[in-house]
């Protein structure tokens, strides 16, 4: 293929001039051999713009340290491609599909697919709606996940998005034996490291491929790593007919990386300084995540909400694509309720009688209305105290508090912090237990027995330990 020369370096953005009529296409990968102390290093660039005069503007996938004007650049003539298939399971990759887990490198015969692809055609899409059981009570009852759907985990810093994702990976692998692909997009390297070792210890890693572009990496890598992971997931869906789970932690960092390079590419910023192409970039990623008549990719995306502001363009753009949202609330973490899922703000389009069944729907709505009533009474309680409430309202408050605590749960992945064994609760059990609480069957059991437990059996056992007759 043709060769060019570096004409300008602006941080992660590099301009390259080619011979006339040999200008590479948009999204083509280019390679520069950058000299290092111990030999040379191959830096991959991706063409983002054609500026005219045979010059292209590219985004670097790694640090541009050592790149100088005049250096030779090789055009590969194709997009960045990553390994796909069984060989990816149990391994950790970077954005370019190179293994970074210090084990044997993959051999050259492995199939590689380009990371830029069209979304499935309209006639290939599946129209069936099927619920994905997670074993997490608050999710299964109030905001159930759909197979092949897109789920957003919304929350500010430190409210438990990553722990919830780890628990979901664990539950899906242990209970459903499903394949997961994890994309670490611009998050802490330490968390990725911990996740890898935890998954290795629990054996879940054998069913998981991991792709990382972490906080310390240039924006180019953080911008493309979600596409690399999605390409691996699409192979399992399209070629093997599997139901795959794609975890993206964190989709906000995907947007953030795009905004970092947008100004350097010469684009005029739009609202709050984000890139003008925000909705397009998000759409290109999200439209590829779907169910087809061959299999499904169900995506669970952690969405960091800057300053807890849900009107910020980044989380607001992600919202438009989601089937279900799981909102994490800081107030609940302060009360010691984990997972800190807000039962009134979390939504799902699957919570309909036609999909989940009449009983499930009614119990979920009754739980929400009881909690809503409790929220409305909190001001009165704060000013006048519980004694001023009517007997009916007192009963509502007591049941609402039991429900609130019972929505918390002990997680398998948090065993080392809590010292409690994790629990997986089937949907049927969850619905039956909450129905019993609403009916007043457990009004005599103290509130504290409902904290961080699995099913009602755990509550009864805990109450007996507290010396309460059940």
UniProtKB/Swiss-Prot annotation:
Pfam families noted in UniProt: ATP-synt_ab, ATP-synt_ab_N, ATP-synt_VA_C
Membrane topology, as annotated: Peripheral membrane protein
Keywords from the named record: ATP synthesis, ATP-binding, Cell membrane, CF(1), Hydrogen ion transport, Ion transport, Membrane, Nucleotide-binding, Translocase, Transport
Record bears the keyword Transport: yes
Location in the cell: Cell membrane
List of residues binding ATP: 155-162
Superkingdom of the source species: Bacteria
One GO CC annotation: plasma membrane
Molecular functions (GO terms): ATP binding; ATP hydrolysis activity; proton-transporting ATP synthase activity, rotational mechanism
Catalyzed chemical reaction(s): ATP + H2O + 4 H(+)(in) = ADP + phosphate + 5 H(+)(out)
EC number annotated for this UniProt entry: 7.1.2.2
Family: Belongs to the ATPase alpha/beta chains family.
Alphabetized HAMAP family for the sequence: ATP_synth_beta_bact
Biological role stated in the UniProt entry: Produces ATP from ADP in the presence of a proton gradient across the membrane. The catalytic sites are hosted primarily by the beta subunits.
Subunit details: F-type ATPases have 2 components, CF(1) - the catalytic core - and CF(0) - the membrane proton channel. CF(1) has five subunits: alpha(3), beta(3), gamma(1), delta(1), epsilon(1). CF(0) has three main subunits: a(1), b(2) and c(9-12). The alpha and beta chains form an alternating ring which encloses part of the gamma chain. CF(1) is attached to CF(0) by a central stalk formed by the gamma and epsilon chains, while a peripheral stalk is formed by the delta and b chains.
Name of protein: ATP synthase subunit beta
Lineage, broadest ranks: Bacteria, Bacillati, Bacillota, Bacilli, Bacillales
Gene encoding the protein: atpD
